[in-house]
């Protein structure tokens, strides 16, 4: 029970690390010098709540153009409109913007005027989900910490797109049209602080190359990935949450050491083509292997031997840390091998 609580706290810590710095900056006390308290100009197309003078609500209004943004605005909500372009002019005075939501519009790359976004020197959050983008927009402000581009038509990432985005911690590219040739060896160069990368629901057949070294959460579900190169995880030594559900991974496509990577705490390999349980690290806590083609569990292969346990033996006095194991949807039949329970003494749930 204590171990599960520790794991949950660790998950919360990681999530907080990705979000909290941005959230603190977004919700910090506003400096009265940033805007004049008597200046409550509000575009007629939008709503400016008196109790929240730094927010501008223009969502769900059938807008085709972005109105002029007053200088006091920090939070801009323009989602669910008919906007096709992002010109520079409406943002001329919007020097304090931290948050822009442009989800569910009709924005194309050709419609984004160069400099329109990069001029926003304090912008932290940019939401452009459910638009018509075919490549990651550029240039973007160096200050940006979260970029949400899910459900577009992105198939290209121009060279140098991320070169100045050293503050970016979260990049969401799920449900786009990315294929393997969208990536070069230096595609992610510049993302020194990226912690969460989501490229689920694309058309990848290979693992993306040279990911940022600080990546902790990597989501690649619902692609067509067939294999993982040897030593692939050496480049991302901090990865803790790895999701590869709904791919085409086979036993032959895995590295020789499997997933024996000490940083990985949560590993999801559901709905693949595995016939064996891969090697895992003694640190791993959650393992999802449901809906594969596994017929039996060879405990002697997957159980870390005493020599494989980390030097910090106190935390491993009860053996490996595995607590949750899903094996349902395979060809395994009960009962659970007793050797499995003997090896993984902290197991709290096994689903067959």
UniProtKB/Swiss-Prot annotation:
SMART domains registered for this protein in UniProt: LRR_BAC (SM00364), LRR_TYP (SM00369), LRRNT (SM00013)
Region forming the signal peptide: 1-20
LRR repeats: 72-93, 96-117, 122-142, 143-164, 167-180, 193-213, 214-235, 238-258, 263-282, 283-304
Keyword Lipid biosynthesis: no
Keyword Protein transport among UniProt keywords: no
Record-annotated LRRNT domain positions: 33-71
Disulfide bonds: 42-48, 46-58, 303-343
Tissue-specificity statement: Cornea (at protein level). Increased expression in the stroma of keratoconus corneas. Also detected in trachea, and in low levels, in intestine, skeletal muscle, ovary, lung and putamen.
InterPro entries: Leu-rich_rpt, Leu-rich_rpt_typical-subtyp, LRR_dom_sf, LRRNT, SLRP
Main location, first listed in the record: secreted
Function text: May be important in developing and maintaining corneal transparency and for the structure of the stromal matrix.
Protein name per Swiss-Prot or TrEMBL: Keratocan
Source organism: Homo sapiens
Gene symbol of the encoding locus: KERA
């Amino acid at each position: 029970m204590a171990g599960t609580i520790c794991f949950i706290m660790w998950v919360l810590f990681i999530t907080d690390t990705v979000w909290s710095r941005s959230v603190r900056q977004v919700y910090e006390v506003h400096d009265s010098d940033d805007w004049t308290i008597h200046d409550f100009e509000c575009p007629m197309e939008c709503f400016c709540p008196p109790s929240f003078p730094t927010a501008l609500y223009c969502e769900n209004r059938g807008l085709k153009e972005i109105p002029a943004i007053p200088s006091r605005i920090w939070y801009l909500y323009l989602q669910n409109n008919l906007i096709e372009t992002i010109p520079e002019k409406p943002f001329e005075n919007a020097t304090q913007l931290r948050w822009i939501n442009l989800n569910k519009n009709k924005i194309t790359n050709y419609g984004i005027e160069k400099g329109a976004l990069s001029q926003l020197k304090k912008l932290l959050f940019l939401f452009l989900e459910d638009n018509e983008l075919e490549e990651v927009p550029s240039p973007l402000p160096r200050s940006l910490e979260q970029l949400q581009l899910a459900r577009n038509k992105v198939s290209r990432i121009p060279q140098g797109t991320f070169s100045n985005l050293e503050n970016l911690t979260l990049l969401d590219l799920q449900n786009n049209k990315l294929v393997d040739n969208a990536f070069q060896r230096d595609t992610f160069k510049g993302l020194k602080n990226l912690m969460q990368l989501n490229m689920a629901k694309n058309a990848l057949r290979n693992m993306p190359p040279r990911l940022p070294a600080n990546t902790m959460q990597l989501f690649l579900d619902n692609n067509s990935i067939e294999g993982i190169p040897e030593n692939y995880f050496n480049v991302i030594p901090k990865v803790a949450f790895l999701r590869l559900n709904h791919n085409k991974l086979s036993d032959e496509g895995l590295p020789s050491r499997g997933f024996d990577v000490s940083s990985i705490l949560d590993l999801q390999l559901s709905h693949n083509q595995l016939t064996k349980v891969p090697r895992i690290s003694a640190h791993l806590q959650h393992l999802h292997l449901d809906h594969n083609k596994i017929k039996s569990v060879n405990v002697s292969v997957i159980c870390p031997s005493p020599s494989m346990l980390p030097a910090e033996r106190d935390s491993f006095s009860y053996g490996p840390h595995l607590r949750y194991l899903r094996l349902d949807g395979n060809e395994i039949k009960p009962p659970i091998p007793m050797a499995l329970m003997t090896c993984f003494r902290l197991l709290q749930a096994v689903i067959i």
